[in-house]
């Protein structure tokens, strides 16, 4: 049995990269997407979501980046927006169903601690809400 966060990180990675397992029967995106990963606090977002997706809680640990659900060779390291240990925005290589690179998906990390305004005004393809965010 795998954990909820690990399982969700795998699915987020598939949507970001377009690299779906053959057995997957859920929704498939046929284009690069915008995905938000939203935690309760910045700290929990980094320690859970960032760690599961990128493989490390520390954005400064370049050797560990790419050891999580998102494959290292899909991460655009030149356009990885960081703030200390936090990854804020990442560009992830997306591939079509034939395996051809067709653009870059965007992943953004956010927290509800920043206020509900950070969740307004954007058209987003996929949102991972970690834990129960509503009372």
Task: Annotate each PLM feature.
Residues 1-135:
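Phosphate/NTP-binding elements of NTP-utilizing enzymes
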